[in-house]
A protein has these predicted regions:
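N-terminal intrinsically disordered, cationic/polar leader segments
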Residues: 2-164
């Protein structure tokens, strides 16, 4: 069996899980998330634990088993604790401003870059004198947060020699 897949997911207090027709819905104090699950993988909720099982030991089933177990575990952690990421803008004259769901970045180009953040993400920008500006983003969905952080990083990749 998959090492990741065979471990049960323990539910923290205040987290509800509903499984119906290949859809797993997780609801907690920070929000709610849902994930479609492949028809071959079964998800069961028993006395405070979630068990993910597969029908056979085929390679496809093994890979899906660990994948869905990890995705559901990330959902449970997200709705109970949430996810947070910090990005530091290293460069001369780099700035970040957050106005509602609009993120305005000054990254050394001739123009400012404006990004509309998804509604689920809460962002703040801090700039202390004498240090690099920091962008702090929080969200319940780990995948969405990672995609937005990667998009922001791709706008101005670090220089390969010093990493700035």
């Amino acid at each position: 069996m998959s090492r990741v897949g065979k471990m049960p997911i323990t539910l923290p207090a205040g987290v509800e899980v509903n499984v119906s027709q290949g859809l797993v819905k997780v609801k907690g104090k920070k929000g709610s998330l849902e994930q479609k699950v492949d028809s071959d993988i079964t998800v069961k909720v028993d006395n405070g634990e979630i068990h993910v099982t597969r029908p056979t030991d085929q390679k496809r089933h093994k890979s899906l088993h660990g994948l869905y177990r990890a995705l559901i575990a990330n959902m449970v952690r997200g709705v109970s604790e949430g996810y947070k990421t910090e990005q530091e803008l290293v460069g001369v004259g780099y700035r970040a401003n957050v106005k509602g769901q609009l993120l305005e970045l000054s990254l050394g180009y001739s123009h400012n870059i404006v990004i509309e953040l998804p509604q689920e993400i809460k962002a703040t920008a801090t700039a202390e004198k004498g240090s690099n500006p920091k962008l702090i983003m929080e969200c319940v969905d780990n995948q969405l947060l990672g995609m937005v952080a990667a998009k922001i990083r791709s706008l101005r990749k670090p220089e390969p020699y010093k990493g700035k």
